[in-house]
């Protein structure tokens, strides 16, 4: 579609700069001509007014940085981006690794590489990801132990080879589908009619050093292949084009991890409950050094776990694009994009569980204290040394089929139609389910000491007399769990867009859209709590087990070889051990995942929207560009959940009533919301090289899938005063953000600029929790309409015969003693205290039970703001250049208070970040080093056991390098290194000594070539 024009003198200057750098590269061609084939695809991009140059073609590091600079310079609002040569020239495992070089963008890593992005302190769930202007679905099941309810797109599924550019829209506009509060990220792929014909192929050898830092049984191949290819051709006088891209990568790697995965239990210093350390003056208090004060907060570890993990991944990407221009003013595009990411993970562990018995401990100072030494006394030495193992296998599959028609009706009017159907699916890829865990133990553990004085915790285990180390002859299977996790998200979207030109510098953009999103998460599991063991150790062949030492796999951490470290553990053959446990129990079904789901959440969102946006340029001495628009969006939510169906209430103990459950069934809830979302962008060209920019917009971020799930889940135990349960709320409002941006940009030299930007987001409707009290009555309803004997006819008879209202023992004795055999009453005997035993069921004539239902609710409003600093400079013709940025993000009222117990609202992902890129490109050589840094940030507000506790990711910096050489016009070679300084990742709790996870990954190196035919 036609582009909004800017002042001619700026266009001519920019064109002159870029034309001086132009060299052929198929992916970078951009144009402002009215050629039909090019107009046909511009409507598929979000930024319809960013490119104002005449046929500019760039290549290399310098050229690609210049293209990124001019994307920023010529855009409406605040936009940053990366072009394909920039991505292709850099050692990026995926797009997330590339995006982190943009100011304000930080990444969350999974399995050693970028997975999800945070923009300006706004987490992955609230950043919209699109492919060629189309909203993309997302799916994941995390580590296989459960389903994901996140909307966040996983960039690890996509290779970077086929991408022409990535655009990050930090300010919104009316034409962008809503959903991105932090940013909207648009991934653009190659189009044959706007690209020079090309055929090339590339191959790489990948060596991940972490693979060699694993036990032999967990290792993959030291060298794995990666291959990619591009075919793009035009036919029939340039009216028909075909582009085919594909890539395949195998990666074998590993990581070693130590931590407290089941979390830390927090207490006040004056508490005296299970898990607390002894109070002053009580038995055991003499074993405490520097005891936390009565108002201090302290935490004790639930366990300590070491693991070695071998991972194999096979990633396949492909895209086929067909374009046809049947007339000079019509272009049609049909494209299909496919990605498959298969992941297999094997894990072996050494762990100890703390039962909070007698202990010896020493502590840091308060007010938030952590143990330096925590020793649990176990005598005799017959507790378990746990050495479990896991096998995980999942496949992530993404498909997208799209069709686009662009019609230039006249010089003043363009229209386009775009439709796509896309899906993202994550499913098990093993006959044993998405993840299977076998507990294996040796019951030889005595006094157990955990030393948390260093980043690497060290465990010391006292073994029984005559036992010097763990042996295969002591090992047997204990507990187990096999999971079946499934997630699928589908999007069907139709967009109609148009632009009417009023004159040389003014126009009206308009459009409408319909989007149907269906998301399903389902989960089932088979768990055996046989923690005392399955059979005896003598029932297992010693050849199943292989002794090893855990410390040698943590060489990047100080303390891994401490003499006090009891690091002996047993590896085992997972398949043989699983088969033996199934044989011993006679129940093979206990050791595989069930096919049926016990939890199944299905949600559909139907959104309709429309927008108008007016753009104009006042060509004064200082040209002023304005864009003002508004978008209307209405969303209807229907959510169904498979939940256990409660059928009745039985009073079986003095203060406890139990729910009776039948077959599970689907329950459905509905909701809707609508918003008018305005935007205003202004940019003032103070000089040909200086721009002052300001923007305002309102955006929304939709609630997570779990928050809007249908159906109510009731807890099995009901008290005399009522029951409890949980439910989602499809009528939840989205987060609403008023966004303000102001920036100064100075393009002071060729390929060089400096910019400073301030941003502020006033966000309302943050989601917390509240309780709904459902009280039964003659004309009311409660969950499942359950009748309780409390307050019923039998109950009232007991009160009438002298039982006090609060004496439930008296009431039960009276009912069971006087109404045995009557409807709902069955007496089974008398207990040791002389009280009647039996059950009293609720009758239809009894009152309806009341339930306190915990549900998500819009509860919090807050503000965050920050600064972005960018500098990019090329040092003349020397070949040297630098690009750097720094981002500051702050929100004082959204921080976590470590000295407060219980649930808190805090913004996760909020952190400063910085990037530095140094490069040299001349005489066929290109060398680049990049350092990416992210400050400490809060990643979660609950720990591994679901306890309200903060999770902080320590600050992290990574150094990468790329060296390329152009042999001739057809052949180039490249060497790449990622994390070459072998940085580690650490997560901790309320105190830095409360290690949650410390992970060693390792450097990765790649050597490859690319040949262009």
Kindly give the residue locations of the regions a language model identified.
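Outer-membrane beta-barrel transmembrane strands
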Residues: 183, 189, 220-234, 247-249, ...
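Outer-membrane beta-barrel translocator/receptor signature
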Residues: 145-153, 161-168, 175-186, 192-288, ...
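Extracytoplasmic beta-strand/coil segments of soluble accessory domains associated
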Residues: 96-140, 170-172
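Flexible glycine-rich, low-complexity coil/linker segments exposed to the extracellular/periplasmic environment
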Residues: 271-301, 364-383, 445-477, 535-597, ...
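N-terminal periplasmic "start-of-domain" segments of outer-membrane beta-barrel proteins
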Residues: 57-90, 116, 127, 139-147
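Gram-negative outer-membrane beta-barrel transporters
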Residues: 762, 767-772, 778-942, 981
């Amino acid at each position: 579609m036609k582009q909004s024009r800017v002042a001619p003198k700026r266009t001519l200057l920019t064109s002159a700069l870029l034309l001086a750098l132009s060299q052929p590269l198929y992916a970078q061609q951009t144009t402002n001509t009215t050629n039909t084939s090019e107009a046909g695809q511009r409507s598929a991009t979000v930024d319809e007014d960013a490119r104002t140059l005449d046929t500019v073609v760039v290549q290399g590091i310098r050229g690609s940085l210049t293209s990124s600079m001019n994307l920023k310079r010529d855009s409406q609002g605040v936009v940053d981006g990366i072009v394909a040569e920039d991505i292709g020239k850099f050692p990026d495992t995926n797009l997330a690794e590339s995006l982190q070089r943009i100011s304000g963008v930080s990444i969350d890593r999974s399995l050693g590489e970028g997975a999800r992005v945070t923009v300006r302190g706004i987490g992955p769930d609230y950043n919209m990801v699109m492919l060629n202007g189309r909203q993309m679905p997302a799916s994941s099941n995390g580590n296989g132990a459960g389903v994901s309810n996140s909307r966040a797109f996983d960039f690890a599924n996509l290779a970077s080879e086929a991408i022409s550019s990535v655009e990050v829209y930090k300010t919104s506009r009316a034409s962008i589908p809503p959903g991105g509060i932090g940013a909207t990220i648009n991934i653009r792929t190659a189009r044959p009619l706007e690209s020079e014909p090309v055929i090339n192929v590339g191959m790489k050898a990948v060596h991940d050093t972490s693979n060699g830092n694993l036990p032999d049984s967990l290792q993959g191949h030291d060298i794995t292949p990666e291959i990619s290819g591009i075919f793009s051709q035009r036919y029939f006088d340039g009216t028909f084009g075909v582009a085919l891209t594909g890539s395949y990568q195998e990666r074998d790697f590993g990581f070693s991890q130590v931590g407290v995965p089941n979390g830390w239990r927090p207490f006040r210093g004056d508490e005296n409950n299970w898990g607390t350390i002894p109070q002053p003056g009580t038995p055991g208090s003499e074993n405490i050094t520097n005891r936390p004060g009565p108002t201090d907060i302290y935490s004790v570890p639930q366990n300590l776990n070491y693991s070695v993990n071998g991972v194999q991944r096979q990633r396949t990407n492909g895209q086929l694009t067909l374009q046809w221009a049947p007339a000079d003013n019509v272009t049609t595009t049909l494209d299909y994009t496919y990605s498959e990411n298969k992941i297999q993970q094997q894990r072996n562990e050494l762990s100890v569980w703390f039962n909070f018995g007698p202990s010896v401990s020493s502590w840091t100072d308060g007010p938030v204290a952590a143990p330096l030494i925590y020793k649990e006394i176990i005598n005799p030495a017959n507790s378990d040394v746990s050495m479990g193992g896991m096998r995980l296998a999942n496949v992530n599959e993404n498909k997208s089929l799209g069709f686009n028609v662009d019609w230039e009706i006249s010089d003043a009017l363009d229209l386009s139609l775009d439709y796509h159907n896309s899906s993202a699916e994550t499913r098990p890829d093993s006959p044993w389910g998405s993840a299977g865990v076998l507990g294996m133990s040796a019951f030889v553990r005595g006094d157990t000491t955990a030393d948390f004085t260093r980043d690497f915790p060290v465990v010391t285990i006292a073994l029984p007399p005559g036992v010097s180390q763990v042996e295969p002859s002591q090992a047997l299977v204990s507990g187990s769990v096999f999971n079946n996790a499934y997630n699928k998200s589908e999007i069907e979207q139709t967009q109609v867009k148009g632009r009417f030109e009023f004159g040389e510098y003014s126009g009206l953009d308009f459009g409408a859209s319909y989007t149907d999103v269906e998301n399903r998460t389902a989960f089932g599991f088979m768990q055996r709590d046989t923690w005392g063991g399955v059979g005896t150790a003598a029932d297992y062949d010693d050849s199943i087990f292989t002794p090893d030492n855990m410390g040698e796999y943590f060489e990047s951490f100080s303390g891994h070889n401490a003499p006090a470290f009891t690091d002996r553990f047993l590896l085992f053959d997972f398949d043989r051990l699983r088969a033996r446990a199934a044989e011993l129990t006679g129940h093979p079904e206990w050791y595989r995942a069930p096919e049926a789901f016990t939890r199944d959440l299905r949600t559909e969102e139907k959104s309709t929207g429309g927008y108008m946006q007016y753009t104009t340029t006042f060509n004064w001495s200082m040209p002023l560009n304005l864009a003002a628009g508004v978008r209307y969006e209405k969303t209807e939510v229907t959510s169904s959940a498979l939940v256990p169906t409660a059928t009745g209430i039985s009073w079986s103990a003095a203060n406890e009533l139990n729910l009776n459950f039948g077959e599970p069934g689907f329950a459905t809830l509905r909701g809707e919301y609508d918003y008018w979302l305005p935007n205003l962008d202004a940019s003032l060209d103070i000089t040909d090289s200086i721009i002052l920019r300001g923007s305002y917009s309102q955006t929304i971020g939709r609630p997570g899938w779990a928050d809007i799930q249908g159906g109510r889940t009731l807890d099995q135990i009901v008290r005399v005063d009522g029951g409890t349960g949980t439910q989602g709320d499809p009528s939840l409002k989205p987060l609403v953000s008023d966004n303000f941006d102001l920036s100064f940009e100075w393009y002071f030299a060729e390929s060089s600029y400096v910019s400073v930007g301030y941003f502020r987001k006033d966000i309302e409707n943050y989601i917390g929790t509240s309780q709904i009290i459902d009280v039964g009555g003659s004309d009311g309803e409660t969950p499942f309409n359950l009748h309780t004997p409390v307050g019923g006819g039998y109950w009232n008879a007991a009160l009438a015969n002298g039982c006090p209202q609060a004496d439930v023992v008296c009431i039960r004795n009276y009912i069971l003693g006087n109404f045995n055999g009557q409807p709902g009453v069955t007496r089974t005997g008398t207990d040791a205290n002389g009280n009647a035993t039996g059950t009293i069921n609720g009758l239809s004539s009894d009152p309806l039970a009341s339930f306190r239902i915990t549900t998500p609710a819009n509860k919090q409003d807050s503000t965050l703001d920050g600064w972005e600093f960018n500098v990019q400079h090329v040092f003349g013709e020397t070949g040297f250049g630098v690009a750097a940025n720094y981002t500051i993000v702050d929100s004082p009222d959204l921080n976590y208070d470590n000295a407060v117990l219980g649930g808190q609202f805090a913004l996760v992902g909020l952190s400063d970040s910085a990037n530095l890129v140094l490069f040299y490109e001349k005489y066929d050589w290109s060398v680049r080093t990049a350092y990416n840094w992210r400050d400490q940030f809060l990643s979660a507000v609950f720990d591994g056991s679901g306890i309200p506790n903060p999770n902080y990711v320590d600050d992290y910096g990574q150094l990468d390098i790329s060296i390329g050489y152009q042999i001739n016009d057809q052949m180039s070679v490249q060497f790449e290194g990622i994390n070459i300084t072998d940085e580690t990742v650490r997560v901790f709790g309320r105190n830095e000594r409360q290690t949650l996870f410390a992970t060693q990954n390792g450097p990765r190196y790649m050597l490859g070539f690319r040949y262009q035919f």
